[in-house]
From Swiss-Prot:
NCBIfam families: RNAP_delt_lowGC. This is Probable DNA-directed RNA polymerase subunit delta. GO terms for molecular function: DNA-directed RNA polymerase activity. Keywords: DNA-directed RNA polymerase, Nucleotidyltransferase, Transcription, Transferase. HAMAP family: RNApol_bact_RpoE. The keyword Transcription applies. The gene is rpoE. GO terms for biological process: DNA-templated transcription; regulation of DNA-templated transcription.
């Protein structure tokens, strides 16, 4: 059966609008309805489902709510959608009481790693640039 993937996604959106409306639904539920609508055979299902799932994930009309539930974005209030998108993409840092110092520890660890990479072990005053320049000079001396 020759089915266009865009047709599957657009039909999935129509099915969600008419059958599920503002109610959450599972991927399995929407897939079963798409299979029924297009009369997709059991033989063709494995060939279509992976691409459909990928397109489904990429389509901004479908929003993952967690616990295997999805919802159409058109039926969501802005605050509900905004809360989910912020949780998914961590648009702002969230601190809980007693954990404020974790960000400072992270910065200290990053500085230690940078010092290690640049060759600064804290025992001397050489900068990374000075160390690199010294290595270049040593290499030149060895090859002359």
């Amino acid at each position: 059966m020759q089915v266009e993937y865009l047709d599957l996604i657009s039909q999935a959106k129509e099915i969600a609008e008419t059958q599920f409306k503002a109610e959450p639904f599972s991927f399995d539920a929407i897939w079963k309805e798409v299979v029924k609508h297009f009369k997709i055979s059991k033989q063709d299902e494995p060939n279509l489902i992976s691409r459909f799932y990928q397109d489904f994930l990429e389509d901004p009309n479908f929003v993952y709510l967690g616990e295997r539930n999805w919802k159409l974005r058109d039926f969501m209030k802005f605050d509900e959608w905004n809360k989910i998108s912020q949780a998914m993409f961590v648009t702002k840092e969230i601190f809980e009481e007693g954990y404020e110092d974790l960000s400072n520890k992270k910065k200290e660890n990053e500085e230690e790693v940078n010092d290690f990479i640049m060759g600064n072990d804290g025992d001397d005053n050489s900068t990374g640039d000075e160390i690199v320049q010294g290595l270049i000079n040593d290499f030149r001396d060895d090859n002359q």
